[in-house]
Regions:
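Beta-sandwich strand segments
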Residues: 121, 190-212, 328-340
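Cysteine-clustered segments with highest specificity for TGF-beta superfamily mature ligands
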Residues: 139-205
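A short beta-strand-loop element at or near the start of a globular domain
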Residues: 37-94, 302
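Feature for long, exposed domains in two main contexts
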Residues: 224-350
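A short, hydrophobic C-terminal helix/tail in secreted or cell-surface proteins
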Residues: 354-373
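Boundary/junction segments of secreted and surface-exposed precursor proteins
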Residues: 22-37, 226-238
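Asparagine-centered strand-capping/turn motif at beta-strand->loop junctions
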Residues: 69-72, 86-90, 94-103, 260-268
Length: 381
């Protein structure tokens, strides 16, 4: 089980300042069974003497065991472990072409082998085990159970898939990935007595038992729920607004607050704010929000402020666009991107008219006064 930890500092994370947070993945396990697979490898030697066939490797066929892949529409894959628990059997038969009579008609054989089950670069391998057998005289011509020796083991274990290979196990929607099985380092030796024409060693390696239900393959997927950035703590709200109303020019800074929540819980991915863009870049508007990496865990809220400095008369508008991505460990598969939009507006007025406005007002007052005087003197206006 992975824990994705970070230190939450500052006063932004509501109720969690100065604490260590961790996103805890959810684990889902896929299981399957398969029929047994068998491979047969035959080595031979002509004439008296010893032959050793070292380090040969034969792949079992068919080799593929399908199992459900991780569906990236359900979350972010952050880890995986493969497990296997199956019986494996090595059977070795000695046989040969020998004369129908005479002495020294013996074939001695031996074989050492191991088996491997692999998934996405991770593998579990059995310990090597060996068997020996021989045939004598006419029994070499028609092999029987008396010329065959078997040894059984259990191939069992679990191992983690490298983060670099997680993408091999994931895809959008249902699908399958495959376990592979193989035989490794089959070291075989044949020793022929002097009256042997050709000696043979038949190595039979079986992965799994006759009962498919006992041949168990599984993969555990560790994943995080997607993050959910929102302007609300109760539901996903991706657009919001701040309205400063009408402010007096040079009347001093005005401040409004807003918050961003990562709706979720300890099983949710954190959020990284990768960039901030603005529609107008109006210099009268500023905010204390800045980009961050893994700065908002699931279920937490960050508080921010927007400041309006009314320096110029007229309407002020800007749209702040916040671009987020899921935060997850390197190699994770399925992270998403998100966007929040904050519309900010306000208006600035000046109660003292501009000089040009004063001129028109004075001209207007003068005209009104002149008309009034003419009327008082009995002259038409």
């Amino acid at each position: 089980m992975y824990k994705i930890a970070k230190f939450v500092s500052g006063m932004a994370a509501v109720g969690m300042a100065g604490s260590v947070m961790a996103a805890t993945p959810i684990t889902i396990t896929q299981n399957t069974t398969a029929s047994q697979f068998t491979t047969i490898q035959t080595q031979s030697r002509n004439g008296v003497g010893t032959s050793t066939f070292a380090g040969t490797s034969t792949v079992v066929g068919p080799t593929l065991v399908p199992i459900s892949r991780f569906d990236t529409t359900t979350g972010i894959l952050v880890g995986a472990r493969m497990s296997v628990n199956i019986p494996i059997t090595l059977a070795l038969t000695a046989r040969g072409n020998v004369p129908t009579s005479g002495n020294n008609r013996r074939v001695n054989v031996g074989s050492t082998v191991s088996g491997t089950v692999a998934l996405a670069g991770a593998s579990v391998t059995s310990t090597s085990f060996a068997v020996t057998e021989r045939c004598d005289n006419d029994a070499c011509l028609v092999p029987t159970a008396g010329n065959t020796t078997s040894s059984a083991r259990t191939l069992s274990g679990s191992t983690a898939v490298s983060a670099a290979n997680l993408a091999l196990l994931a895809g959008a929607g249902p699908g399958t990935v495959n376990f592979t099985t193989s035989v490794n380092a089959t070291n075989t030796q044949i020793v022929n007595r002097s009256n042997v024409i050709t000696g043979f060693a038949d190595t039979r390696f079986t992965v799994g038992g006759t009962t498919a239900a006992n041949n168990q393959y599984s993969v555990a997927y560790d994943y995080l729920n997607f993050a959910s950035p929102s302007f609300s703590t109760g539901s996903t709200v991706t657009s919001s607004s701040l309205n400063f109303g009408t402010l007096l020019i040079n009347g001093g800074l005005a401040t409004l607050n807003f918050s961003i929540t990562n709706i979720g819980n300890i099983n949710s991915a954190g959020l990284s704010l990768t960039s901030i863009s603005r529609s107008t870049n109006n210099s009268q508007l500023t905010s204390n929000i800045t980009t961050f990496s893994n700065g908002l865990d699931g279920g937490l809220t960050n508080n921010y402020s927007m400041t309006f400095d009314p320096l110029a008369v007229g309407a002020v508008n800007d749209i702040f666009t916040f671009n987020f991505i899921d935060f997850a460990p390197a190699g994770s598969v399925g992270a998403r991107s998100y966007q929040l939009n904050l519309a900010v507006s306000g208006n600035v007025f000046d109660p003292v008219p501009e000089p040009a406005s004063w001129m028109f007002m004075l001209l207007g007052f003068g005209l009104v006064g002149a008309v009034a005087r003419r009327r008082a003197a009995g002259q038409p206006g």
